[in-house]
Amino acid sequence: MAGQPLRRPAWVPLLLRLLLAGIAACDASPADDSAGPGGRGPRGRARGDAGADEAVPRHDSSYGTFASEFYDLRYLSEEGYPFPTAPPVDPFAKIKVEDCGRTKGCFRYGKPGCNAETCDYFLSYRMIGADVEFELSADTDGWVAVGFSSDKKMGGDDVMACVHDDNGRVRIQHFYNVGQWAKEVQRNPARDEEGVFENNRVTCRFKRPVNVPRDETIVDLHLSWYYLFAWGPAIQGAITRHDIDSPPASERVVSIYKYEDIFMPSAAYQTFSSPFCLLLIVALTFYLLMGTP
């Protein structure tokens, strides 16, 4: 037995060929995009097949594709609207004149017995915590305002105005009177603002702090002031001169802690209430009586 060469089993060459074939198959994996013409694409279509690239959609931007598909399928309704419509805005709560003199103070200017919807001008105020809530309404399509004055005259006054603009909105703005002109002040103390233009009337509601940092354009409402009442037209959302030459004002200073319901007749209803007219009537009556035989 010694001296004879060792023989390899017959199955060894076969095993080597199988191993080499397996290595070659791994180098040309079906998942490899670099496979040759005999390989297969990512969808299993042979690279050599006609129209292979056209049939397999490519996603160059996975995020962009996801976003567009998500938007198209999730947010577009059958009618083609991208988003559901927003819920309607709460309507403007009607001003309650029955609370005047009880839980809030009111000023009415116009026809006797008028209310917030029929007076030429209407103002109410009430305390809510550290704020004062104001409600204003006037027979105008422009603006309505209240001024806080120390002398019942225009000039150097703190003014809050509700202005109806060309877009149909009512905005609350802060002004400072310089003589007969109102200059808008960017520092606006108003909050919780709401307003509406209906039936040719501008109506609004807002709150303002009672105490504010010292500023010549903003007064402290815990002090008593004369209230100036004004309204007039607006051009492209900018206020113009008020409707009457001498706007009405409170007869005395107003305290926000005292609630009264004060009526002031407009000029059309002052004919027989002014002292001059009453004196004229008395004189005419006396003359007629004396002249009667």
From Swiss-Prot:
Tissue-specificity statement: Expressed in the brain (at protein level). In embryos expression is evident in the ventral forebrain, but a lower level is seen in the remainder of the embryos. In the adult brain, expressed in the cortex, cerebellum, hippocampus and basal ganglia.
Localization: Cell membrane; Synapse
Entries under InterPro entries matching the protein: DOMON_domain (IPR005018), FRRS1L (IPR042789)
Region (Disordered): 29-60
Signal peptide start and end residues: 1-28
GO MF terms, alphabetically ordered: dynein intermediate chain binding; protein-containing complex binding
UniProt biased composition (Basic and acidic residues): 46-60
Gene Ontology annotations of biological process type: regulation of AMPA glutamate receptor clustering; regulation of glutamate receptor signaling pathway; regulation of postsynaptic membrane neurotransmitter receptor levels; regulation of synaptic transmission, glutamatergic
GO CC annotation terms, alphabetical: endoplasmic reticulum membrane; plasma membrane; postsynapse
Description of how the protein assembles with itself and partners: Component of the outer core of AMPAR complex. AMPAR complex consists of an inner core made of 4 pore-forming GluA/GRIA proteins (GRIA1, GRIA2, GRIA3 and GRIA4) and 4 major auxiliary subunits arranged in a twofold symmetry. One of the two pairs of distinct binding sites is occupied either by CNIH2, CNIH3 or CACNG2, CACNG3. The other harbors CACNG2, CACNG3, CACNG4, CACNG8 or GSG1L. This inner core of AMPAR complex is complemented by outer core constituents binding directly to the GluA/GRIA proteins at sites distinct from the interaction sites of the inner core constituents.
The protein's role, per its UniProt record: Important modulator of glutamate signaling pathway.
Protein's recorded name: DOMON domain-containing protein FRRS1L
Originating organism: Mus musculus (Mouse)
